[in-house]
């Protein structure tokens, strides 16, 4: 695997993402937890099983002492880029986007972590909120229906790749829950 500076797609504070032949390689900083990298690979593998069009996991490896996740490269433009460059068709793009979101929510994956559990942990960690407010939020959260439908967690037009044939691929799956 040859990772070159000119093949960088995006650089974040905790990772650098490369285009490498027919793959995308996310190389995480040395301090990024190994368990988080394997968890992202596991989440992606579980979503593969739902039948959604996503970049499939190719492997997890060490690259120069840093953990890396290799996934399929999906050719196309982000829906965000298409919306920005073709404003006259924004309504069609929004309809396609909503249809894709409904397709995602129509999938189940019972082995993924629960979004309600994540939100409860986050609410409990908000020490700036008084106990009564936290309790009210937790009560409202608990009253929400229980299910195992997939929730992307960061679904926005920049996380949808539209291929030349119009096929939409969902990317950036690290925040997916049920």
PLM features: what roles do these ranges have?
Residues 11-37:
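ATP-binding glycine-rich loop module of kinase domains
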Residues 169-172:
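Pre-DFG segment of protein kinase catalytic domains
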Residues 35-50:
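The N-lobe alphaC helix and its flanking beta3-alphaC-beta4 segment of protein kinase-like domains
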Residues 80-115:
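Conserved kinase catalytic-core helix
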Residues 176-178:
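Conserved small/polar residues in nucleotide/adenosyl-binding loops
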Residues 106-153, 158-164:
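An alpha-helical support segment within catalytic cores of ATP-dependent transferases
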Residues 56-67:
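Short beta-strand micro-motifs within the conserved protein kinase catalytic domain, predominantly
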Residues 65-77:
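Conserved short submotifs of the Hanks-type protein kinase catalytic core
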